[in-house]
A protein has these predicted regions:
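Hydrophobic alpha-helical segments at protein termini of multi-pass membrane proteins
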Residues: 1-221
């Protein structure tokens, strides 16, 4: 099956949802659609660069694909921040939608291209790919949010976060293509679960007395 046919099958319902929804629902679908489109375009560019420089499959997966794919996630998100200036509470969710659109198309295409070796390997790969893209999205969105108010940190942080996400992606691809592929799929899952546990243990929505930010003691009297 052609990659373009698969893209149209997956993206068409999302395009219909974009036309029907409004406000936050529409915005989430926009980013999901952008993620799938970015995945398709990144495949074209990765294949072109690999052919241009006669790179083998390993070099393409470890040295070319991470840069191209993270670029297609990072640049639209950066433009979104600079031009539309969204509310801070929207940013992480929007980046997640972009990453999940990317991961969804990548998973389906890999299944069509390589077939399946059983439900467990397919499930492990699906969770691993999804977690890897979500971890990279979290790194970028949370990192930029924490440094956005300072111009110098914003400039340096943008470069640093992009390179870190590329390195994480490259290590994942390297392990997945080795005989330790299961370790490659487990690393982003463990990373994601660890981050969720740390966030839940800190209870960011409350202060030391259990009050929400901006809530006075008098209101609880």
């Amino acid at each position: 099956m052609s990659m373009e046919y698969l893209y149209f099958c997956l993206a068409a319902p999302i395009a219909v949802a974009i036309l029907c929804l409004e406000d936050r629902g529409k915005q989430t679908m926009d980013f999901l659609f952008a993620g799938m489109t970015g995945c398709l375009l990144s495949r074209y560019i990765t294949d072109f660069v690999a052919v241009r420089y006669a790179a083998n499959a390993m070099v393409a997966a470890v040295e070319i694909a991470p840069v191209v794919e993270e670029g297609f996630k990072f640049l639209p998100f950066l433009v979104y921040l600079l031009i539309f200036k969204p509310k801070k509470e929207w940013i992480t969710g929007d980046m997640f939608a972009l990453a999940l659109g990317f991961a969804t198309f990548e998973n389906v295409w890999n299944l069509v291209e390589n077939g399946g070796a059983g439900i467990f390997p397919i499930l492990l790969r699906g969770l691993g790919v999804g977690a890897m893209h979500v971890v990279c999205a979290s790194l970028i969105s949370i990192g930029l949010l924490s440094m956005w108010d300072s111009f110098y940190l914003r400039v340096l942080g943008t470069v640093g976060l992009f390179l870190t996400s590329v390195a994480y992606h490259a290590v994942y691809n390297l392990l997945v293509l080795s005989r330790f592929s299961w370790i490659g799929h487990l690393i982003p899952l463990v990373t994601m679960i660890s981050v969720l546990l740390i966030r839940s243990s800190k209870n960011p929505g409350t202060d030391e007395k259990g009050n929400s930010p901006g809530t006075s003691t008098r209101e609880h009297a």
